[in-house]
């Protein structure tokens, strides 16, 4: 069979493996990669072995170092980018900093153990940071001979999903053996195919960035003599046509204006797309009316807020974080998109303090409003140095 041509026409979906550290996430990831490479050879489906996935390269996201592996593969229906964070701490950091946004995830539970404390923690976190869908791979199923035990473990996992408002009743639960599938055992290779069919069917197709309402964080502001004020930045989502109305949101009262010109690399464009760096010429806007940290958005799509609840990972001393704990009423800077705003932290009831290396929930009140929505990431900084990173879980005001 000749090499299949890489088709950009397939829907692209971001997924990941989550679950307890010894339940075989990385082995399963390697097995998916091998089985799909054998069954559907293509430019994308290149087998990745365990070692290459496990020795995850370090990435920096909002000032935090995370080990994370990216594996790419495709089924006949979809193209997938799959993230695997080998260590428990890496997984927690990845989820909270949004280093890899997931459209859905495979919860890996060893049939030999059932759900463990880390399994529960990962499911809770997936809910908090807004992973839309979970399905289950019961790994190491080859090591359990008793059907009843498998049924009990499945029941327990379904209850765990339901307890965090995932669809525990209907989520696919597939018995797999990553190790046996890697060894080429036909029965278990088939189960990996079955798992990927379940992923294709059950993880909803995400709304792509370009189909969402337009948003561009302002990075810089210039005056072009005779033409007016230009704001530059990278469009985060949506598309924007020339002569569209937009709002400038955050930090000061919201203002409406019209985009009379769009430029990219000194070329005039008719529209700006998600992912592009561009300059927008704003009608009748003075240079001092706009500043870095505001966002340019489709009118009515985003509102500014000062109070929110979030979940955050606080860097350990070894990671370059604080050397000592912080208490309630701590006032660091919160870095959203392109700017720092001071905020006051209130800790959850019963929590005296937060130690470096901890994960915590918090309530925050900012001194200036910021354009935000649930799921938005932020860094916590002190004098320009990152001491933590988190995600907005709920907007209060």
Swiss-Prot record:
<keyword id="KW-0963">Cytoplasm</keyword>
<dbReference type="InterPro" id="IPR031157">
    <property type="entry name" value="G_TR_CS"/>
</dbReference>
<protein>
    <recommendedName>
        <fullName>Elongation factor Tu</fullName>
        <ecNumber>3.6.5.3</ecNumber>
    </recommendedName>
</protein>
<feature type="region of interest" description="G2">
    <location>
        <begin position="63"/>
        <end position="67"/>
    </location>
</feature>
<dbReference type="InterPro" id="IPR005225">
    <property type="entry name" value="Small_GTP-bd"/>
</dbReference>
<keyword id="KW-0547">Nucleotide-binding</keyword>
<feature type="domain" description="tr-type G">
    <location>
        <begin position="10"/>
        <end position="207"/>
    </location>
</feature>
<feature type="region of interest" description="G4">
    <location>
        <begin position="139"/>
        <end position="142"/>
    </location>
</feature>
<dbReference type="InterPro" id="IPR009001">
    <property type="entry name" value="Transl_elong_EF1A/Init_IF2_C"/>
</dbReference>
<dbReference type="InterPro" id="IPR000795">
    <property type="entry name" value="T_Tr_GTP-bd_dom"/>
</dbReference>
<keyword id="KW-0251">Elongation factor</keyword>
<dbReference type="Pfam" id="PF00009">
    <property type="entry name" value="GTP_EFTU"/>
</dbReference>
<feature type="binding site">
    <location>
        <begin position="19"/>
        <end position="26"/>
    </location>
    <ligand>
        <name>GTP</name>
    </ligand>
</feature>
<comment type="similarity">
    <text>Belongs to the TRAFAC class translation factor GTPase superfamily. Classic translation factor GTPase family. EF-Tu/EF-1A subfamily.</text>
</comment>
<dbReference type="InterPro" id="IPR004160">
    <property type="entry name" value="Transl_elong_EFTu/EF1A_C"/>
</dbReference>
<feature type="region of interest" description="G5">
    <location>
        <begin position="177"/>
        <end position="179"/>
    </location>
</feature>
<dbReference type="GO" id="GO:0005829">
    <property type="term" value="C:cytosol"/>
</dbReference>
<feature type="region of interest" description="G1">
    <location>
        <begin position="19"/>
        <end position="26"/>
    </location>
</feature>
<dbReference type="GO" id="GO:0003746">
    <property type="term" value="F:translation elongation factor activity"/>
</dbReference>
<dbReference type="InterPro" id="IPR050055">
    <property type="entry name" value="EF-Tu_GTPase"/>
</dbReference>
<dbReference type="GO" id="GO:0003924">
    <property type="term" value="F:GTPase activity"/>
</dbReference>
<comment type="function">
    <text>GTP hydrolase that promotes the GTP-dependent binding of aminoacyl-tRNA to the A-site of ribosomes during protein biosynthesis.</text>
</comment>
<dbReference type="GO" id="GO:0005525">
    <property type="term" value="F:GTP binding"/>
</dbReference>
<dbReference type="InterPro" id="IPR033720">
    <property type="entry name" value="EFTU_2"/>
</dbReference>
<dbReference type="InterPro" id="IPR041709">
    <property type="entry name" value="EF-Tu_GTP-bd"/>
</dbReference>
<dbReference type="InterPro" id="IPR009000">
    <property type="entry name" value="Transl_B-barrel_sf"/>
</dbReference>
<keyword id="KW-0378">Hydrolase</keyword>
<feature type="binding site">
    <location>
        <begin position="139"/>
        <end position="142"/>
    </location>
    <ligand>
        <name>GTP</name>
    </ligand>
</feature>
<feature type="region of interest" description="G3">
    <location>
        <begin position="84"/>
        <end position="87"/>
    </location>
</feature>
<dbReference type="Pfam" id="PF03143">
    <property type="entry name" value="GTP_EFTU_D3"/>
</dbReference>
<keyword id="KW-0342">GTP-binding</keyword>
<dbReference type="Pfam" id="PF03144">
    <property type="entry name" value="GTP_EFTU_D2"/>
</dbReference>
<keyword id="KW-0648">Protein biosynthesis</keyword>
<dbReference type="InterPro" id="IPR004161">
    <property type="entry name" value="EFTu-like_2"/>
</dbReference>
<keyword id="KW-0479">Metal-binding</keyword>
<feature type="binding site">
    <location>
        <position position="26"/>
    </location>
    <ligand>
        <name>Mg(2+)</name>
    </ligand>
</feature>
<dbReference type="InterPro" id="IPR004541">
    <property type="entry name" value="Transl_elong_EFTu/EF1A_bac/org"/>
</dbReference>
<dbReference type="InterPro" id="IPR027417">
    <property type="entry name" value="P-loop_NTPase"/>
</dbReference>
<comment type="subunit">
    <text>Monomer.</text>
</comment>
<feature type="binding site">
    <location>
        <begin position="84"/>
        <end position="88"/>
    </location>
    <ligand>
        <name>GTP</name>
    </ligand>
</feature>
<keyword id="KW-0460">Magnesium</keyword>
């Amino acid at each position: 069979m000749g090499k299949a041509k890489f088709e950009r026409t397939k829907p692209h979906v971001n997924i990941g493996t989550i679950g307890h550290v010894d339940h075989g996430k990385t082995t399963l990831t390697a097995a998916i990669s091998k089985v799909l490479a054998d069954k559907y050879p293509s430019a994308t489906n290149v087998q990745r072995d365990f070692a290459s996935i496990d020795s995850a390269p370090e990435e920096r996201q909002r000032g935090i170092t995370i080990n994370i592996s990216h594996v790419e593969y495709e089924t006949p229906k979809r193209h997938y980018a799959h993230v695997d964070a080998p260590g428990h701490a890496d997984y927690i950091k990845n989820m909270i900093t949004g280093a890899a946004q997931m459209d859905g995830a495979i919860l890996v539970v060893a049939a030999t153990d059932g759900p463990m404390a880390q399994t529960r923690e990962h499911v809770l976190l997936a809910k908090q940071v807004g992973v839309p869908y979970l399905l289950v791979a019961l790994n190491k199923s080859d090591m359990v001979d008793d059907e009843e035990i498998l049924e009990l473990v499945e029941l327990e996992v379904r209850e765990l999903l339901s307890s965090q408002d995932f669809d525990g009743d209907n989520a696919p639960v597939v018995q797999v053996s990553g190790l046996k599938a890697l060894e080429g055992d036909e029965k278990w290779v088939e189960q990996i195919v079955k798992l990927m069919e379940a992923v294709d069917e059950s993880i909803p197709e995400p709304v792509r960035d370009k189909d969402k309402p337009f948003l561009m964080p302002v990075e810089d502001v210039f005056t072009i003599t005779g033409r007016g004020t230009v704001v530059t930045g990278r469009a985060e989502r949506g598309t924007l046509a020339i002569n569209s109305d937009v709002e400038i949101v955050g930090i000061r009262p919201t203002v409406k204006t019209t985009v009379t010109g769009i430029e990219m690399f000194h070329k005039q464009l008719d529209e700006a797309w998600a992912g592009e760096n561009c300059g927008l010429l704003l009608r009748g806007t003075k240079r001092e009316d706009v500043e870095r940290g505001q966002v340019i958005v489709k009118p009515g799509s985003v509102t500014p807020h000062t109070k929110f609840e979030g979940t955050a990972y606080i860097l350990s001393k070894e990671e370059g974080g604080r050397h000592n704990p912080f208490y309630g009423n701590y006032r660091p800077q919160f870095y959203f998109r392109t700017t720092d705003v001071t905020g006051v932290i209130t800790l959850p009831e019963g929590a005296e303090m937060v130690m470096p290396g901890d994960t915590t929930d918090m309530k925050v009140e900012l001194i200036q409003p910021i354009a935000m929505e649930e799921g938005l990431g932020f860094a916590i900084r002190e004098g320009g140095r990152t001491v933590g990173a988190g995600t907005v879980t709920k907007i209060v005001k």
